[in-house]
């Protein structure tokens, strides 16, 4: 069996920054450090940070006075931000991905101008909750759609005063279909100046599409609650190839590999490379040969951590 590796795969700049913020806060201020929601959606990362002194919470009320709090990479609503600022916290750091913040600013701008806004996204995802929570104009409207059917059923106040934006980790193909429906249903709707789906999501979907063309099956390293990882597995399955979303090498079932001559491996944007290396090692134990990395788009984007945290610290082992 041959192993093919998608390129690019794994950590994106926003995830790298968010993890670094938690690591550096622990290094500088000591444990415990409180983080609202999982800083990124990856079990290995979250468990590793817990071992180092991070405490993940869902409600600001769970944070003791005098503590240090970090918002996750997914972002928070205006209400959550205001609640945190009203508390007696020693420090408050924001690990929201800058590309999510871009979408927040689009929604806030629409709210200020009194435009109704439609968000394309998955209900219940923390990024969607944070983005929807940037809209506060009682005379306008903020709506969530996930599919073309949602668009056809949507009623707004003023079809001539509409804009839309998207969650950053969606399927490029699915989102295109929803945008087509929006443009048909509301001809005067205005979209973002630049695509809201982030570069990492787009690049990893393109890479896994290329991978699936050559592989018999594809293993996607990522946690079940990772939106972008799920989209990678779904894309492969739609191409007619088996795809399995796995947290680690331990999840690999030998029968998946029966008859496969070429195994593709990729990783979601929140999955560290150590997990990919462990998957490769496990596949070799099961009889696979050396791994070959495909060519792909080069990524050199870096997002700086807050200036208060710009010190050198050891990374997660």
From Swiss-Prot:
Binding site for dimethylallyl diphosphate: 41, 74, 125, 226-228, 270
InterPro entries according to UniProt: LytB/IspH
Keywords, comma-separated and alphabetical: 4Fe-4S, Iron, Iron-sulfur, Isoprene biosynthesis, Metal-binding, Oxidoreductase
The organism's place on the tree of life at top rank: Bacteria
Top EC category: oxidoreductase
Keyword Iron-sulfur: yes
Cofactor: [4Fe-4S] cluster
Binding-site list for [4Fe-4S] cluster: 12, 97, 198
Reaction(s) catalysed by this chain's protein: isopentenyl diphosphate + 2 oxidized [2Fe-2S]-[ferredoxin] + H2O = (2E)-4-hydroxy-3-methylbut-2-enyl diphosphate + 2 reduced [2Fe-2S]-[ferredoxin] + 2 H(+); dimethylallyl diphosphate + 2 oxidized [2Fe-2S]-[ferredoxin] + H2O = (2E)-4-hydroxy-3-methylbut-2-enyl diphosphate + 2 reduced [2Fe-2S]-[ferredoxin] + 2 H(+)
An example Gene Ontology biological process: isopentenyl diphosphate biosynthetic process, methylerythritol 4-phosphate pathway
Active site positions, chain numbering: 127
Pfam families named in the record: LYTB (PF02401)
GO molecular function: 4 iron, 4 sulfur cluster binding; 4-hydroxy-3-methylbut-2-enyl diphosphate reductase activity; metal ion binding
Co-factor note (free text): Binds 1 [4Fe-4S] cluster per subunit.
Binding site for isopentenyl diphosphate: 41, 74, 125, 226-228, 270
Sequence positions that bind (2E)-4-hydroxy-3-methylbut-2-enyl diphosphate: 41, 74, 125, 168, 226-228, 270
Cellular compartments per GO CC: cytosol
Pathway, per record: Isoprenoid biosynthesis; dimethylallyl diphosphate biosynthesis; dimethylallyl diphosphate from (2E)-4-hydroxy-3-methylbutenyl diphosphate: step 1/1; Isoprenoid biosynthesis; isopentenyl diphosphate biosynthesis via DXP pathway; isopentenyl diphosphate from 1-deoxy-D-xylulose 5-phosphate: step 6/6
EC numbers: 1.17.7.4
The protein's assembly and partners: Homodimer.
Protein role: Catalyzes the conversion of 1-hydroxy-2-methyl-2-(E)-butenyl 4-diphosphate (HMBPP) into a mixture of isopentenyl diphosphate (IPP) and dimethylallyl diphosphate (DMAPP). Acts in the terminal step of the DOXP/MEP pathway for isoprenoid precursor biosynthesis.
Family the UniProt entry places it in: Belongs to the IspH family.
Entry-linked PANTHER family: 4-HYDROXY-3-METHYLBUT-2-ENYL DIPHOSPHATE REDUCTASE (PTHR30426:SF0)
UniProt name for this protein: 4-hydroxy-3-methylbut-2-enyl diphosphate reductase
